[in-house]
A protein has these predicted regions:
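Short sequence/structural segments immediately N-terminal
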Residues: 18-119
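Positively charged n-region of N-terminal signal peptides that target proteins for export
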Residues: 1-5
Length: 119
């Protein structure tokens, strides 16, 4: 009986550690892990901005460049593949896909079948 309990305990422990590793990392987490301070994106008025639904490009372009620059960086090697930043909808706000402190979404998949991995 003790052996079964020990095996069950360690099995549960391994299962929980595997689940913890599968937790998605949000963009905010990635930025913090790279040493980017909250104020870089949110500015000095961070508490006021956190209450707003900020759909602007400005915080992103400071580090990542403007839309055409991002499109060049994300051009796939295979011309058969689609570039998520070269779109017919125009220059959508970055936050259309990249949610910062929430899970990102593949906006293109609303109408198309593109298997983009959106960080």
């Amino acid at each position: 009986l003790k052996t079964k309990l020990v095996v069950l305990f360690f099995g549960a422990l391994l299962s929980f550690s595997a689940i913890a590793q599968d937790k998605p990392q949000f963009l905010g987490d990635r930025h913090v892990a790279r040493g980017v301070q909250c104020q870089v994106c949110h500015g000095p008025q961070i508490s006021a901005q956190l209450k707003e639904d900020d759909q602007r490009h400005e915080p992103c372009v400071q580090c990542h460049g403007f839309y055409d620059q991002v499109a060049k960086k994300t051009t796939p090697e295979n011309p058969e593949e689609m570039n998520p930043h070269s779109q017919h909808d125009g220059n959508l706000p970055c936050s259309t896909c990249h949610k910062g402190h929430k899970p990102s979404v593949n906006y293109c998949a609303e109408c198309h079948y593109y298997n983009f991995k959106v960080p």
